[in-house]
Structures are given as structure tokens and as C-alpha cells.
Regions:
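Flavin-dependent oxidoreductase catalytic cores
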Residues: 2-144
């Protein structure tokens, strides 16, 4: 892949690391695979669920529940990770990055719920000039 992939772009993979059921892919197997990917030039792994079986009863659903797994993969495979799954608050996203559980947070549900989530998060976290997370044509008119 690296032979044809532009060097100026990161090479990332979203990988379902486990189905959290006996007999399915294990996190240890995923870490071994990620190490192989890294040796071939992978820059970042987006840690996700497997969804290879219909039974999701073993999944530990909850706020930011994949972040600890992203942290483990980041540590053991020594590769940057993206953490996602039910990251809803600015504080959750900030903690994941600050505590080095992930290098990037994925915000699908949060962004669907609030397309201006980055601006609201920046304001909540006290970021100066938070309005500039919005497009310039909007930010210009907002008073903070």
C-alpha cells in the first residue's frame, strides 16, 4: 500500500478489534495484526467493534467504552489510535486525549446530534476565540 499511497497522507485503518464474545476475535489477536500493519507502514488505527457476529450482548456499552481498548492498543502496539463510540461531552473527549487513551477522538454520534459540537466543546473547555472552530463566514458574526 505504501508504494502507491501518497507520503503526505496518513495511512489509517478502522479495525473491529473484538466482538466481546467467546470464540470471536480477541483483542490480543487484533494487537498482533495491528503490529503487522504498523510494520507495513500504518500510521494510525481507528479502534472499533467487530460486528462479525449478530450477538452483541457481550459488548460493554457505555460512554466512551472503547477508549480503554484504544489506550491498550496504543501502548502495546506502539501506534497512534483513534477512540470512539459514545463520546458525547467535551470533557470526555478532552480526557481521552489528555490521558493518552487515544490521539484522536471520533465523534459520529455527537456530531450528528449537534453539527456545531466543536464550537460548543471549545466554549465549554474555555478555548480562547472558540468561535473560530466555525467557518469564518459564521465566526465573524459571533460575539463571545
Amino acid at each position: 500500500m505504501r508504494e502507491v499511497w501518497p507520503t503526505r497522507l496518513p495511512l489509517t485503518v478502522r479495525l473491529g478489534i473484538s466482538d466481546f464474545k467467546e470464540g470471536s476475535q480477541t483483542i490480543e489477536e487484533s494487537i498482533a495484526l495491528i503490529k503487522r500493519f504498523k510494520a507495513l507502514g500504518l500510521d494510525l488505527i481507528d479502534v472499533s467493534l467487530g460486528f462479525n457476529i449478530p450477538d452483541v450482548s457481550g459488548v460493554p456499552w457505555g460512554p466512551a467504552f472503547m477508549a480503554p481498548y484504544a489506550a491498550r492498543i496504543r501502548r502495546e502496539a506502539e501506534i497512534p489510535t483513534a477512540a470512539g463510540w459514545f463520546i458525547a461531552t467535551p470533557q470526555q473527549a478532552d480526557a481521552i486525549v489528555r490521558e493518552e487513551q487515544g490521539d484522536i477522538v471520533m465523534l459520529a454520534h455527537a456530531m450528528l446530534d449537534d453539527p456545531n459540537w466543536p464550537w460548543h466543546a471549545a466554549k465549554a473547555l474555555g478555548v480562547p476565540n472558540a468561535k473560530w472552530t466555525l467557518p469564518a463566514q459564521y465566526a465573524h458574526w459571533i460575539r463571545e
